[in-house]
UniProtKB/Swiss-Prot annotation:
Catalytic activity: (2R)-2-phosphoglycerate = (2R)-3-phosphoglycerate
Gene source species: Allorhizobium ampelinum (strain ATCC BAA-846 / DSM 112012 / S4)
UniProt-recorded Gene Ontology molecular function terms: phosphoglycerate mutase activity
Domain of life of the source: Bacteria
Keywords: Gluconeogenesis, Glycolysis, Isomerase
Similarity section: Belongs to the phosphoglycerate mutase family. BPG-dependent PGAM subfamily.
EC number annotated for this UniProt entry: 5.4.2.11
InterPro entries: His_Pase_superF_clade-1 (IPR013078), His_PPase_superfam (IPR029033), PG/BPGM_mutase_AS (IPR001345), Phosphogly_mut1 (IPR005952)
Top-level enzyme category: isomerase
A single BP term in Gene Ontology: glycolytic process
Entry annotation: catalytic residues: 10 (tele-phosphohistidine intermediate), 88 (proton donor/acceptor)
Protein role: Catalyzes the interconversion of 2-phosphoglycerate and 3-phosphoglycerate.
Protein's pathway: Carbohydrate degradation; glycolysis; pyruvate from D-glyceraldehyde 3-phosphate: step 3/5
Protein's recorded name: 2,3-bisphosphoglycerate-dependent phosphoglycerate mutase
Length: 211
């Protein structure tokens, strides 16, 4: 067994609360989102982990979640790499729209297909497959080598960018990943083997409220 990879979806954002498609837009965390990030940090502290490096996206809601977690671990000065490769899925023309308004405009079935299909993107946006096509190469070149060297690595990112990693790590099919939702602020702790496969996975919190 080699290193440890911890994946955390950012805490609730203003636009999560308002039921808006967010994508690459950059709303702040809500008060609840801050609480969720703190809860994730406390869970990791209780777990007894100290990180060697952190990765996060180009968006402030993930960066703030990352910072809050590290504060809870007494690691506020830890090297943190920010890269848009870890950004949320780009929702294109849906970005900034209320999900109910989008259903009224395009129809419930079409919006459901855009949200939950693996490879059909919304107009001007990305599918989950498209998101994985930028996230996975970044993971392979920048993140995985550190884990295989025995480092403990934190990745604070977004629902869909993390789902694209979970799909491969958990060996899920493109049909299975469609029913997987990640709760905000709940750490997933992966210990990897030397061949980069998963040796164990611990979820430090409740995923039942995921959306």
């Amino acid at each position: 067994m080699t290193g440890t990879l911890v994946l955390v979806r950012h805490g609730q954002s203003d636009w999560n609360l308002k039921n808006l498609f967010t994508g690459w837009r950059d709303p702040d965390l809500t008060d609840l989102g801050v609480q969720e990030a703190n809860a994730g940090g406390k869970a990791l502290k209780d777990y007894g982990i100290q990180f060697d490096i952190a990765f996060t996206s180009d968006l402030s809601r993930a960066q703030k979640t990352c910072g809050i977690i590290l504060d809870n671990l007494g690691q506020s000065g830890l090297e943190t790499i920010r890269d848009q490769a870890l950004n949320e899925r780009d929702y294109g023309d849906l970005s900034g729209l209320n999900k109910d308004d989008a259903r009224a405009k395009w129809g419930e079935e079409q919006v459901h297909i855009w949200r939950r299909s693996y490879d059909i993107p919304p107009p001007g946006g990305e599918s989950l497959r498209d998101t994985g096509a930028r996230v996975w190469p970044y993971y392979l070149t920048e993140i995985l080598p550190r884990v295989l060297r025995g480092e403990k690595v934190l990745v604070a990112a977004h629902g869909n960018s993390l789902r694209s990693l979970v799909m491969v790590l958990d060996k899920l099919t493109k049909e299975q990943i469609l029913s997987v939702n990640l709760a905000t602020g709940v750490p997933m702790v992966y210990k990897l083997n030397a061949d980069s496969t998963v040796a164990s996975k611990d979820v430090l919190g409740d995923m039942s409220g995921a959306h």
